[in-house]
């Protein structure tokens, strides 16, 4: 039998305990993996072992897929009404609200984000997402299409079947909600793999999924490595769709595996190198505040982080000074500490990756204007870092770093800055700051990006679509658009009085 992980917190911001089954969640129960191997889960705040979780192998994926198929053919899919699916989703959201402190603490423990941030942002958005799709479950309509008087013609939106979902470590619970919400609302069954770095909130959610009344096999959670468990999901011949959030590099591998197997439907939400354009007429105070939020939220570990900050020459010096002052106010430390703004990066691997980019920036001739060093003596903490004196060909300007590192770049001409902003392989998001609303909207429309923020940054809502252009992905998360990711459209032609 799988072990139970328990943990007690007695901190300035939270006092409580949790209990998490560390097994694989297959067919409505926790089980050991076939090979009974485990993965270490590490606390990024101190580098110490939290617990061990079961590792899913290809054989475990086969078992999970069979359970999902059985549920789809018997208790879910077209065998369960949209209103019943919606009731269960809403019950799940209520249980998340009831357990919000527990889930927030778990998120802070293995991810490193602060407890207060996890509660106010991640959990709030996760709950609103599940509620949003609870409302959609009985409203996924087709339409009657007028052709001629001899026929009745209409469309149906039908669930795809068994979907594989692979989620990242930067927003573990939120990405789970983004994935399972629309998939369950439309009647699909799920085999989901959380990141091996941050699996605990997904495993805790399995107990809530049980309590909410979802039939066995509808949601299966399999923990493991991307190269093995993720690969097995992407290439499985009986999985009808795969949805992946993560790096563009791995997204290519997922798409390739999907194509080489059964040409399964693919949704990808991938990397970004988002531009922020600040014109001379911008509200200086607000642009500083929003830009800091856009770059440093979640410790810079966000695909839509505004890392290329273009500031018009008329306010460049003032902006840089105020932005520097703002950055120096950011307080790093224990995710369960009082007044902490930024915790550690998620892992040693990610810490090393970010520090290598900082060294690359120095080596290529950029200036570290602020930050650029490790913080403290333990854990994976990195100072918020800004480069100046960059050129477009530098790695820190071109490549996604996925950490608290950005570049502030001076520009002169409004038309030229759009070319610079769009000069990227990515196109996930962009932001513009100007008090001239016509100029701001014109700039927003000129961005080659799936999301454009005007006088704000990194604002997300469950009802608003999110996704990328170019190498930032395929398909859209959130809102009504996400339902399309999980449905097949069937056209039905009914002969009324057409004689041959």
UniProtKB/Swiss-Prot annotation:
It comes from the Eukaryota. One of its GO terms (molecular function) is aldehyde dehydrogenase (NAD+) activity. It catalyses: an aldehyde + NAD(+) + H2O = a carboxylate + NADH + 2 H(+). The record marks 170 as: Transition state stabilizer. Pathway: Alcohol metabolism; ethanol degradation; acetate from ethanol: step 2/2. The active site is at 269 (proton acceptor), 303 (nucleophile). Its EC number is 1.2.1.3. Keywords: NAD, Oxidoreductase. It is an enzyme of class 1 (oxidoreductase). InterPro entries: Ald_DH/histidinol_DH, Ald_DH_C, Ald_DH_CS_CYS, Ald_DH_CS_GLU, Ald_DH_N, Aldehyde_DH_dom. Pfam families: Aldedh. NAD(+) binds at residues 246-251. GO terms for biological process: ethanol catabolic process. Belongs to the aldehyde dehydrogenase family. This is Aldehyde dehydrogenase. The lineage of its organism: Eukaryota, Fungi, Dikarya, Basidiomycota, Agaricomycotina. The gene is aldA.
């Amino acid at each position: 039998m799988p072990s139970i992980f328990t943990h007690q917190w007695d901190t300035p911001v939270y006092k409580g305990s949790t209990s998490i089954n560390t097994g694989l969640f297959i067919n409505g129960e926790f089980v050991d993996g076939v090979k009974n191997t485990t993965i270490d889960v590490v606390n990024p705040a101190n580098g110490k072992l939290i617990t061990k979780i079961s590792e899913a192998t290809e054989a475990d994926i086969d078992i999970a897929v069979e359970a999902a198929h059985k549920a789809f053919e018997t208790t879910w899919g077209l065998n369960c009404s949209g209103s019943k699916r919606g009731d269960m989703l809403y019950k799940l959201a209520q249980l998340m609200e009831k357990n919000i402190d527990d889930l927030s603490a778990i998120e802070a423990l293995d991810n490193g984000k602060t407890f207060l941030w996890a509660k106010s942002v991640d959990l709030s958005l996760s709950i609103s997402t599940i509620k949003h799709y609870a409302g959609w479950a009985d409203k996924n309509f087709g339409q009657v299409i007028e052709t001629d008087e001899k026929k009745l013609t209409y469309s149906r939106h039908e669930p795809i079947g068994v979907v594989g979902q692979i989620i990242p470590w930067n927003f573990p619970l939120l990405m789970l909600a983004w994935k399972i919400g629309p998939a369950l609302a439309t009647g699909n069954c799920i085999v989901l793999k959380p990141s091996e770095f941050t699996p605990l909130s997904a495993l805790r959610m399995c107990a809530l999924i049980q309590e909410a009344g979802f039939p066995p096999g509808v949601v299966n959670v399999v923990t493991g490595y991307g190269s093995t468990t993720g690969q097995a999901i992407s290439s499985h011949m009986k999985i009808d769709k795969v949805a992946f959030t993560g790096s563009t590099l791995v997204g290519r591998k997922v798409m390739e595996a999907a194509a080489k197997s059964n040409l399964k439907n693919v949704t990808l939400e991938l990397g970004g190198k988002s531009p922020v354009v600040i014109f001379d007429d911008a509200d200086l105070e607000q642009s500083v505040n929003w830009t800091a939020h856009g770059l440093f939220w979640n410790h810079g570990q966000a695909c839509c982080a505004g890392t290329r900050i273009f500031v018009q020459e008329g306010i460049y010096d003032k902006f840089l000074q105020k932005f520097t002052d703002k950055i120096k106010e950011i307080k790093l430390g224990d995710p369960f500490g009082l007044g902490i703004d930024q915790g550690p990066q998620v892992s040693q691997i990610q810490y090393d990756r970010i520090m290598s980019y900082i060294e690359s920036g120095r080596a290529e001739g950029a200036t570290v204007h602020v930050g650029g060093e490790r913080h403290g003596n333990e854990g994976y903490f990195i100072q918020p870092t800004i480069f100046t004196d960059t050129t477009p060909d530098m790695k820190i300007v071109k490549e996604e770093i996925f950490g608290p590192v950005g570049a502030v770049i001076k520009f002169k001409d409004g038309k030229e800055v759009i070319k610079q902003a769009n000069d990227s392989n990515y196109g996930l998001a962009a932001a513009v700051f100007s008090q001239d609303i016509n100029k701001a909207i014109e700039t927003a429309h000129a961005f080659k990006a799936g999301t454009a923020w005007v006088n704000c940054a990194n604002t997300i809502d469950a009802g608003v679509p999110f996704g990328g252009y170019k190498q930032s992905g395929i398909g859209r998360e959130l809102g009504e658009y996400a339902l399309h990711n999980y449905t097949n459209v069937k056209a039905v032609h009914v002969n009324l009085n057409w004689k041959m």
